[in-house]
């Protein structure tokens, strides 16, 4: 399976974040050099004890060597602890540098794909996979790996035969690592993909739990989720079987190799070609030389997860480049000018809005009507900047939407979607769009404009009522009003409402009309996607869409009159046809 090419822009961005910790990586490298040099303490102590202390029977020499070893091992422990702590800080810094960028990119990706929560969670999981690898002992094993030749060279210095045994053993472990990577890569990748699909399915079923219970679908949904989960588990078990098999082999082979080294050393001692101390020291040095390889084999799943996460992050960051540094623009007037607009929904090849043009002046409201599938919601998502423009332009105050900073644009536009989602937090937090420093006066004014103020005060804790605890007791109309209040916060230039009265009663519809009149009176513009005639009572203009195109546009009453006349002419023609025998 060939790995697809990694986009250059995203990879460069990741490498820059990694390079920001270059000095810390350099420190880890220096400390790793010190640790590996101090690792020679044990073998050299063994060599001196067997070859000098036992031969001379000198307690003073043994005491001096032992005190030196205690000091050197203490220093090794301090240095090893330092490099472990440094890698943890490198991992934390890497996360700090990229988490905001990844979060924003994943949100934009989710807005395009229609699933913000899943895209955001996936991007942050990939970043977490890379962070776990950077802070893991596996990374330290990579730093230790270049020092393996030093220990092998020391073994060769004792005797070439011992060096050959150690080299052959090392080559076998390296081949084991490469084979492990090749054979476990596909199952681990498939397991990750299948697990993600099962998790997305579980999240969807959780969110739709009320419908599932009401329609008696619990058994069916469990069966479908369990099938997806079983597939993920099957791939995970397959990958674990392969990886664990190589891990067990490498561990067992390393133990065997130590015995083989002792046997070869004993043979050379019998031939009086090496000393007993050299036999023991060479066995320890070989174990130290092969330890990083064995650690890489055992932690290969972590390496694979980090590599896959790195690749996915590179693609995500390439698809969603960072925001440009834009010149701040003054607050625009509500002059909305849409010219020859075409929009292609994400994941599709055909435009569902084609060549639509219209214009609004400050203080005007426009209704958009048409049958289901006419492109009303697509138009709404393009107007708020959530979906990109394929052709044509959308201008607000003379500037296209992409000339505004996204966060600034969000404060200039109020949006009420068909399905209102309230976030974890208080009602005030939701109305203030989760702002860290909300304006309480504007929150209350927005709620009053949406006729939600008294309704909120009637809740257990008023504006401080937490949505996560009470969302099950909020009706669709209450959620709709809170969503409308959020759309009116802080003071939008353009208000886009998609089926705003779908969950409102007569009182709520009247409150909606009052909110529309308020926005118009303040010089704003309002665009309403509607099915019900009551939703366009406050509209001066009317846009009729059919199959993604503009069928009619103009003053509301004139457009409605023309539609009635056209309908009457069609009916008259049909009746005349039937009278003449035409079928």
PLM region spans:
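An intracellular "coupling" helix at the cytosolic face of ABC transporter transmembrane type-1 domains
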Residues: 15, 19-22, 111, 122-134, ...
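Transmembrane helices of ABC transporter permease
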Residues: 65-72, 140-190, 263-274, 291
């Amino acid at each position: 399976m060939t790995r697809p090419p990694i986009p250059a822009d995203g990879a460069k961005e990741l490498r820059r974040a990694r390079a920001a910790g270059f000095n810390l990586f350099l420190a880890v490298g220096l400390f790793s050099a010190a640790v590996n040099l101090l690792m020679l303490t044990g073998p050299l102590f063994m060599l001196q004890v067997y070859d000098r202390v036992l031969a001379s029977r000198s307690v003073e020499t043994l005491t001096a060597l032992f005190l030196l070893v205690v000091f050197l091992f203490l220093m090794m422990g301090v240095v090893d602890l330092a490099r472990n702590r440094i890698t943890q800080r490198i991992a934390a810094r890497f996360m700090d540098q990229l988490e905001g960028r990844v979060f924003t990119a994943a949100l934009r990706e989710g807005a395009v794909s229609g699933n913000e929560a899943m895209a955001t969670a996936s991007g942050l999981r990939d970043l977490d996979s890379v962070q776990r690898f950077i802070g893991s002992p596996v990374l330290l094993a990579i730093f230790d790996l270049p020092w393996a030749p030093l220990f092998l060279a020391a073994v060769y210095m004792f005797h070439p035969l011992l060096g050959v045994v150690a080299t052959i053993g090392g080559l076998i472990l390296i081949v084991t690592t490469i084979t492990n990577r090749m054979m476990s890569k596909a199952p681990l990748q498939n397991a990750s993909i299948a697990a993600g699909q099962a998790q997305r399915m579980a999240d969807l079923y959780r969110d739709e739990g009320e419908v599932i219970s009401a329609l008696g679908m619990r058994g069916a949904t469990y069966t479908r989720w369990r099938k997806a989960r079983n597939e993920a588990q099957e791939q995970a078990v397959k990958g674990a079987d392969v990886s664990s098999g190589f891990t067990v082999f490498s561990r067992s082979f390393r133990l065997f190799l130590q015995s083989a080294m002792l046997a070869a050393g004993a043979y050379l001692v019998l031939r009086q070609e090496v000393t007993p101390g050299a036999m023991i020291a060479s066995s320890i040095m070989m174990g130290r030389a092969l330890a990083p390889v064995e650690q890489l084999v055992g932690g290969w799943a972590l390496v694979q997860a980090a590599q896959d996460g790195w690749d996915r992050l590179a693609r995500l960051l390439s698809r969603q480049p960072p925001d440009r540094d834009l010149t701040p623009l003054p607050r625009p007037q509500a002059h909305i000018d849409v010219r020859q607009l075409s929009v292609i929904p994400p994941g599709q090849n055909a435009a569902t809005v084609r060549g639509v043009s219209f214009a609004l002046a400050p203080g005007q409201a426009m209704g958009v009507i048409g049958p289901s599938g006419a492109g009303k919601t697509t138009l709404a998502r393009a107007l708020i900047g959530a979906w990109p423009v394929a052709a044509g332009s959308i201008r607000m105050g003379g500037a296209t939407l992409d000339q505004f900073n996204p966060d600034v644009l969000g404060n200039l536009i109020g949006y009420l979607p068909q399905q209102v989602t309230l976030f974890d937090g208080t009602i005030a937090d939701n109305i203030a769009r989760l702002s860290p420093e909300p304006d309480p006066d504007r929150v209350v004014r927005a709620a009053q404009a949406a006729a939600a103020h008294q309704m909120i005060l009637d809740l257990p804790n008023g504006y401080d009522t937490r949505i996560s605890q009470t969302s099950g007791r909020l009706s669709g109309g209450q959620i709709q009003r809170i969503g409308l209040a959020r759309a009116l916060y802080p003071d939008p230039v353009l208000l886009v409402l998609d089926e705003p009265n779908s969950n409102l009663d007569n009182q709520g519809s009247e409150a909606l009309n009052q909110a529309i009149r308020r926005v118009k009176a303040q010089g704003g513009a309002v665009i309403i996607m509607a099915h019900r005639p009551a939703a366009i009572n406050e509209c001066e203009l009317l846009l009729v869409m059919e199959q993604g195109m503009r069928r009619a546009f103009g003053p509301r009453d004139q457009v409605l009159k023309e539609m009635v006349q056209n309908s009457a002419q069609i009916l008259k023609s049909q009746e005349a046809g039937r009278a003449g025998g035409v079928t």
